[in-house]
Curated annotation (Swiss-Prot):
Forms a heterotetramer with UvrB during the search for lesions. The lineage of its organism: Bacteria, Pseudomonadati, Pseudomonadota, Gammaproteobacteria, Enterobacterales. One of its GO terms (molecular function) is excinuclease ABC activity. This is UvrABC system protein A. ATP binds at residues 31-38, 640-647. The UvrABC repair system catalyzes the recognition and processing of DNA lesions. UvrA is an ATPase and a DNA-binding protein. A damage recognition complex composed of 2 UvrA and 2 UvrB subunits scans DNA for abnormalities. When the presence of a lesion has been verified by UvrB, the UvrA molecules dissociate. It is found in: Cytoplasm. PANTHER family: UVRABC SYSTEM PROTEIN A. The keyword DNA damage applies. A zinc finger (C4-type) spans 253-280, 740-766. The gene is uvrA. It holds the Pfam family UvrA_DNA-bind. Keywords: ATP-binding, Cytoplasm, DNA damage, DNA excision, DNA repair, DNA-binding, Excision nuclease, Metal-binding, Nucleotide-binding, Repeat, SOS response, Zinc, Zinc-finger. Residues 310-587, 607-937 form the ABC transporter domain.
Amino acid sequence: MDKIEVRGARTHNLKNINLVIPRDKLIVVTGLSGSGKSSLAFDTLYAEGQRRYVESLSAYARQFLSLMEKPDVDHIEGLSPAISIEQKSTSHNPRSTVGTITEIHDYLRLLYARVGEPRCPDHDVPLAAQTVSQMVDNVLSQPEGKRLMLLAPIIKERKGEHTKTLENLASQGYIRARIDGEVCDLSDPPKLELQKKHTIEVVVDRFKVRDDLTQRLAESFETALELSGGTAVVADMDDPKAEELLFSANFACPICGYSMRELEPRLFSFNNPAGACPTCDGLGVQQYFDPDRVIQNPELSLAGGAIRGWDRRNFYYFQMLKSLADHYKFDVEAPWGSLSANVHKVVLYGSGKENIEFKYMNDRGDTSIRRHPFEGVLHNMERRYKETESSAVREELAKFISNRPCASCEGTRLRREARHVYVENTPLPAISDMSIGHAMEFFNNLKLAGQRAKIAEKILKEIGDRLKFLVNVGLNYLTLSRSAETLSGGEAQRIRLASQIGAGLVGVMYVLDEPSIGLHQRDNERLLGTLIHLRDLGNTVIVVEHDEDAIRAADHVIDIGPGAGVHGGEVVAEGPLEAIMAVPESLTGQYMSGKRKIEVPKKRVPANPEKVLKLTGARGNNLKDVTLTLPVGLFTCITGVSGSGKSTLINDTLFPIAQRQLNGATIAEPAPYRDIQGLEHFDKVIDIDQSPIGRTPRSNPATYTGVFTPVRELFAGVPESRARGYTPGRFSFNVRGGRCEACQGDGVIKVEMHFLPDIYVPCDQCKGKRYNRETLEIKYKGKTIHEVLDMTIEEAREFFDAVPALARKLQTLMDVGLTYIRLGQSATTLSGGEAQRVKLARELSKRGTGQTLYILDEPTTGLHFADIQQLLDVLHKLRDQGNTIVVIEHNLDVIKTADWIVDLGPEGGSGGGEILVSGTPETVAECKASHTARFLKPML
């Protein structure tokens, strides 16, 4: 079996295609966005490979696995078990970190448990248990003739007169003791003060160091250890300042007796109670009610709503504030910012123990007076948040919560004991906070001695390999402690790719979805090297990809097309790259051979130095106090290697600030910055990302873009509808009335099968049309509402040509290249690139003011060369209306058409975070320090 044969694949829009795919090769599937690449790679090949493997398991095991739907295909042979690495599923679990996903943390836990050296957190001395022979040898290694005494500590730093203890010691025959550092006779002990802390050590033996003492010393040590419960001190008799030798037979700190259980891997896991910091439960952050969120606008007065829910409108709470104002003599009508710090403290944190006279008035106007302390607004919110049963109250209060690093563990997530175990003077949290590149250096230079080297050998190999794979997929800038929620789709995908290589499987079919997303050209070669490595192990690697380098590196290319959606689903060309270039119908071939290309614009829009948006002192994540200057009304690209700080600067700093000031939204807290100027040039900010436009099958392009409302109004205006009294609501499949109630307007009914995938069967009442018979009797221009929803955008544009409002909205969907999706197509079936373009179309169809700030993060994801051309036309059109466009992008075709580039770097992670150069593409291409310039120059 050296090939995979597919016959009659009809999944989604595939048109009954037949394919022969060579095994153990690197195969790139390419084509327009929406042409059916994912349908072939994921929904047919992967789904079938996975399904066959899972069906070989017992029925009992199958119920725990989510089964894939059986693809609509006549026959596939030559499949191997399949593993898919997609972008979607990043973990939203706050306990997942880069270290735990890659399993490096598990190996680190093992390493620290087996060769770690525990130390005392207070005295920084190694905890060690010694045998009597080791103690004797240590004493005998002192210079010969030295006068020493052996002490057994009985009482350490405890208050009291301790007369009983001293009498007991004397009665046991001991003559001397050292009390608080002074040696005295036990026959006449000093009187100890009751309120002071005392230390009492018994002198067990006094001797001069010489060779024949071994037996005597061993007996003395045994006595001393028994008396003291496991510790002994050897002190110099002549020089009281000399350093004393501390011995312990327990696994403990010889100074304070701090001891810990035997080291085991779970002590280093922050997801296990044995290792997690008890304050934050191993999350590394604590939630608290943030005064800055509670008081959004310090210019308002308390009466005017400085604290939401505590103003005039809320009678009960406002009475409390008024009584508080009478007591502390402040004015509830004065702006919050003008009140004294003490008033701020009382209002937010309460009056402590001080009783205050509160006047309460009930609905009838009767006043009652009660005296009690004021709990404070923040404490009140905290209490209500903990006690409430209502999810609405909890959601409302959650808006005021922020996170801060846990004070006990300083954000390391581990308990105190685990933070004080060292390997080569480095504790575990220090390794987790290193970037992966640094960690790799650390382990390469780690030299352990003797037995420890043998124990650690295998563990270190596993850690080293995994770090190396992460570096090879371009993730050297991440830290192991980075939370999984903060990773971008491309990063998460490449982490999973690295852990797959770490697994070293052979004979598997890997299906990858655009692994180059979010990767700078510089890291691309390493990524391709990784894929080729997977192939050379003996795996079939199938990649859905648009990247030119990937297509050139492939052994076998499959070009799906010729168009998208209903116009796609056929194999236009397949074979090595030369064969693809020779097929005139293949768009991919034309772009690869240079017959078509994305042109560099003839002239760029010059920047107007008067009109700029200036953000100063951005310091989020790895940004090093940078100042960003964006020309207003231009198409700007933010570039830089992965991890250089692009997303932090734009998505985490600029966007939240602009959102607060322009849209009045209070969603996200911007990363730290000093100042921003120039927002007055804009009236709104819009972020167009690739998140799905709706998570339910009921959401679709028609409802999202607002096309559906006028369509329903048209249907409600038909004479027949008016005669029956139908309103536009009758034509909605989301409300009772017009929809089919058997399937509640879904068109399908879900049948749960416990050992097989859930089956969706068309509803037998409406035959999948979503509406009841009466609604479907109404026709507009001869079509029912169901037939309209079933039209592609292109057909609908023609059909509604006479309705200008609809025609305009549909035209914008066509402008962004979505001619082929259906109006009623479920949002869950759209790809990321398609969802993003539906959003773009929605923005385009609004009447533009020409003063909008658009922010796009890697809009070329999932787009073919021809799609990128269309996207650029749309973005340039938006710019020509005077809008400002900021795009984070790695794609050189987009970068070269920008008016202005801001390049961050020079490296990722701690090696980045500076703005290297900003200016026109021609200026940037000349910058020696920039990695982007190196790749951009040949394009211009």
